[in-house]
Amino acid sequence: RFKLLKYLAYLSFISIIVQVWHDYFGLGSTFVNIPGNDGWAMSLYFFNTEWGENRLASIFWEPGQYQIVLIFVMGLFYKEMLDPFTLKPYLKHLLILTIALIMTISTSGYIAFGILISGAIVNSAYGRKHIYLLPLLSFLAFSIFLLLWNSDAVQKKIAQGEVNEENSFNIRMADNLALLTMVGNKPVFGYGAGTKSAEDAKNKFGSISQSNGWLRSAAENGTPYVLYILVLIYSSIKRRVHIASAALFLLFAFILSQSGEGNTYFPYTYMYVFKYCTQQT
């Protein structure tokens, strides 16, 4: 896990430099056509630098996917976050990931990060030892969440709901309602992943981009499938942190992190589904 953190920190550090270079110091970009997609404007051949206004996407197809990677890798060190004395060897790498997350300007990422940090504060070794300080720690955690909630990025997304046009907020709301309808129609087995009946149902109920991975999985594979995956993730987290409430905080952060993306990005989710011989490599 430390190798993964280290390499992601290196990638994020370079990505931040390239993005700042592009946004403020004139680094150019080349439009790359991709079959079946609209293509991307890439800087230095690898970095997706023009997704939205000054938003960091790194080498990923959009900032929303990048924040999922950042949140899930941060979660590998949640146990250390609960005891700051063990966090020092990883602190500089996690700080780079935090800066990168802020630069994604992702609403889902901000809220997920707020929940992750809130859980770390409330369930920290210091907080559990000094239980009388729990109200103060809870207030501090809520203040962090409120600060992120009132950020320009989040408030702009919320304000979009009042505009009668195709934008991120309205598209995702339409997707959620359509996918929820599909889940309600076939809650146990779903419509099948990638089947014609699933695609027909998405079109019928008004899903534009299938932007909620959890609901999409439930609509295609059935609710029991998604619940089973979430139980496995929770069990894995609890084995690592040994605190049920802390595990719930991190699980909730993971759910929200992926609630605005069309896939559940299992290469990262698998880190919390399967058991590994060691967490160190």
Where are these regions (language model features)?
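Interfacial juxtamembrane loops and adjacent helix segments
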Residues: 26-55, 195-214
